[in-house]
């Protein structure tokens, strides 16, 4: 009996010691002073910044299969002061970047188990086949602190050249007679992004509406808009965020709309999360919204902030468990020291629908468990809190790898450098290794998204052409 007990204890000890804790596998970067591949947008914006500056890549981040990822910059470079009537936003054309993440195992003894080399393979501009509403410039004339400002039309010049309607980050591109959920507004502030299971389209959430749009992945043309619950929208619009906040008693707070977006592994349900509480809610209670892609039916659940000042991302573990990125605004880019950059596991399986509720929703909030403290984990690799990016916003699982003989899930986390590389550094990508044992410690499991083996949508067309050519050749041989 004693021998059996000793054997059991030794077995348990070995199992515990061999189980890996979540660790940083690799760190990579893309030059924040570089430009993307959209040469047509290379000209200077209203604020003098190049319209194709390669920045803000971590606002949204999604796996597209293999080593391919999609990154969505937000509404563009608006940190350069030029016109307070539009909160310094410019006619930056919204887009997403297709990236290759080359992850290669290092020799033993290296500080990191892998090396990560990101590269940019494509830039896709986002557009609509139907007309959008742009600011006329008339509403953008006035005086601020004794200085008079004026604006031109908010439509990008590229509209006329390419005979299309591009979405832009400029805050006055809306119809003032309609609410913020009007899908004909040209203003768009992309945040979360996910790739459909067939690999042919992308879903992108936004802060202005909030909206969730589906775009054709090859062309960037909008396919459809999902109608979100009316209580998320505001009825009185303004090109100035502070004015919009002060004039609305309900709806999303300006610049803090649907910050994160997840897609369940089966590709059937979108799960969006707001960055901050709605105007009608209190006690740090913000909302999670699920959308059935086929039926468009929505549900709302509550999430209680505990450490950070807001939420930046959500990604799926399975059909009911998710990881949520909760953070403060401190760190590199803010000139301060990062404190709260934490990833929590949540579970919606027994959550209460709060669609018809408002106020203090904290008692209805989903359960949450701390999974990764990013500041602590990066500190283990010698990265000081002052060098941890202030805006850790993108999060996505990628391909599994083997680490010391253990199958390990890769969790990619990216920063939004606000198009300010001189202050916030380059576009950074952190790869964390997550094992099933790590997930079991917080009562979670992981199911990978069922993405196609061929990640690039253009390849489908090439394959189709190739099949036709092969068929023609076969017929000739006959």
Q: Residue ranges of each PLM-predicted region?
A:
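A short, hydrophobic C-terminal helix/tail in secreted or cell-surface proteins
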Residues: 455-474
């Amino acid at each position: 009996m004693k021998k059996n007990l000793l054997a059991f204890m030794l077995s348990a000890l070995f199992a515990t010691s061999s189980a890996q804790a979540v660790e940083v596998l690799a760190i990579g970067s893309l030059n924040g002073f570089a430009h993307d591949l959209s040469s047509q947008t290379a000209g200077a914006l209203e604020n003098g910044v190049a319209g194709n500056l390669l920045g803000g890549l971590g606002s949204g981040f999604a796996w597209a299969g293999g080593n391919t990822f999609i990154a969505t910059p937000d509404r563009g470079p608006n940190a350069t002061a030029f016109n307070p009537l539009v909160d310094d936003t410019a006619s930056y054309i919204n887009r997403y970047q297709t990236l290759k993440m080359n992850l290669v195992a290092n020799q033993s003894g290296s500080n990191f188990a892998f090396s990560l080399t990101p590269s940019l393979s494509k830039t896709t501009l986002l557009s609509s086949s139907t007309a959008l509403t742009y600011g006329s410039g008339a509403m953008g004339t006035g005086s601020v602190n004794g200085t008079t400002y004026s604006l031109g039309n908010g439509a990008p010049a590229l509209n006329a050249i390419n005979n299309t309607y591009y979405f832009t980050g400029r805050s006055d591109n809306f119809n003032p007679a309609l609410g913020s959920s009007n899908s004909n507004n040209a203003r768009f502030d992309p945040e979360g992004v996910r790739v459909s299971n067939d690999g042919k389209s992308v879903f992108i959430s936004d802060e202005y509406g909030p909206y969730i749009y589906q775009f054709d992945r090859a062309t960037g043309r909008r396919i459809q808009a999902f109608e979100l619950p009316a209580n998320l929208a505001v009825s009185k619009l303004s090109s100035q965020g502070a004015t919009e906040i002060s004039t609305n008693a309900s709806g999303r707070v300006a610049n803090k709309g649907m910050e994160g977006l997840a897609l369940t592994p089966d590709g059937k349900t979108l799960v969006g999360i707001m960055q901050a509480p709605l105007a009608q809610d209190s006690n740090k209670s913000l909302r999670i919204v699920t959308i059935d892609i086929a039926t468009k039916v929505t549900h709302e659940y509550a999430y209680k902030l505990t450490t950070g000042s807001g939420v930046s991302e959500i990604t799926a573990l399975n059909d009911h468990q998710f990881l949520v990125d909760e953070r403060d605004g401190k760190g590199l880019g803010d000139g301060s020291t990062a404190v709260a950059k934490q990833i929590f596991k949540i579970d919606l399986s027994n959550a209460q629908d709060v669609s018809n509720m408002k106020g203090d929703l904290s008692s209805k909030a989903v359960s949450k468990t701390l999974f990764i403290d990013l500041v602590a984990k990066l500190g283990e690799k010698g990265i000081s809190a002052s060098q941890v990016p202030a805006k850790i916003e993108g999060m996505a699982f990628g391909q599994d790898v083997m680490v010391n003989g253990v199958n390990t899930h890769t969790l990619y986390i990216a920063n939004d450098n606000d198009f300010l590389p001189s202050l916030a550094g380059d576009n950074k990508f952190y790869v964390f290794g997550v094992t099933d044992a790590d997930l079991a410690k917080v009562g979670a499991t992981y199911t990978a998204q069922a993405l196609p083996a061929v990640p690039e949508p253009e390849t489908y067309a090439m394959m189709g052409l190739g099949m036709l050519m092969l068929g023609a050749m076969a017929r000739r041989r006959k």
